[in-house]
């Protein structure tokens, strides 16, 4: 009887802890013949999704903070953090991310003609004292003490050109690229 009670207690503890927290590992081939590993953590209680892309010098961490309405992406080989106000028409809700992950795992190559182009500019010197309450603590932990770049969605994409873009894994499926040398 003691074993049954202990088993039920352990099952209850682990069941409660994993209730609002999901972790997915995705390994996919990269363009240079290696592999890209992604770890996607969906926290339904905090209303966030954290995507870690492990790809050598192109490794990055991206936080989708649905509670505060911001996306922050940090390419780990660069000393910069890119912040974008979430556009709910182009960014799927948190509960749909699991479906996108399933599609990514089920389909090796998925092409979408819909892209969201974003232009990033350094935050002005007047905004050095960032209101972290507005952006939320997950983004503060990712981006504090490094230069910040504010993103804005580019509506007119006819004149857009990119010198170099980082678009990998789940971010690529969502149509999000981090680009340098954008001409608008």
From Swiss-Prot:
Superkingdom per UniProt: Eukaryota
Predominant location category: secreted
GO CC aspect terms: basal part of cell; extracellular space
Domain BRICHOS: 54-151
PROSITE patterns, alphabetized: BRICHOS (PS50869)
Signal sequence annotation: 1-20
Protein name per UniProt: Gastrokine-2
Naturally occurring in which organism (per UniProt): Homo sapiens
């Amino acid at each position: 009887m003691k074993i049954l009670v202990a088993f039920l207690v352990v099952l209850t503890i682990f069941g409660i802890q994993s209730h609002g927290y999901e972790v997915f590992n995705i390994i996919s081939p990269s363009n240079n013949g290696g592999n890209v590993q992604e770890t996607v953590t969906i926290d339904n209680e905090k209303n966030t999704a954290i995507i870690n892309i492990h790809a050598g010098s192109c490794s990055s961490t991206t936080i989708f903070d649905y509670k505060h309405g911001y996306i922050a992406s940090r390419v780990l080989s660069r000393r910069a953090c890119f912040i974008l106000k979430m556009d709910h028409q182009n960014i799927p809700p948190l509960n749909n991310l699991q479906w996108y992950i399933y599609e990514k795992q089920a389909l090796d190559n998925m092409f979408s003609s819909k892209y969201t182009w974003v232009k990033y500019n350094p935050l002005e010197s007047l905004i050095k004292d960032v209101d972290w309450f507005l952006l939320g603590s997950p983004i503060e932990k990712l981006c504090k003490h490094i230069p910040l770049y504010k993103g804005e969605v580019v509506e007119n994409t006819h004149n857009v050109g990119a010198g170099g873009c980082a678009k990998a894994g789940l971010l690529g499926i969502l149509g999000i690229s981090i680009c340098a040398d954008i001409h608008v």
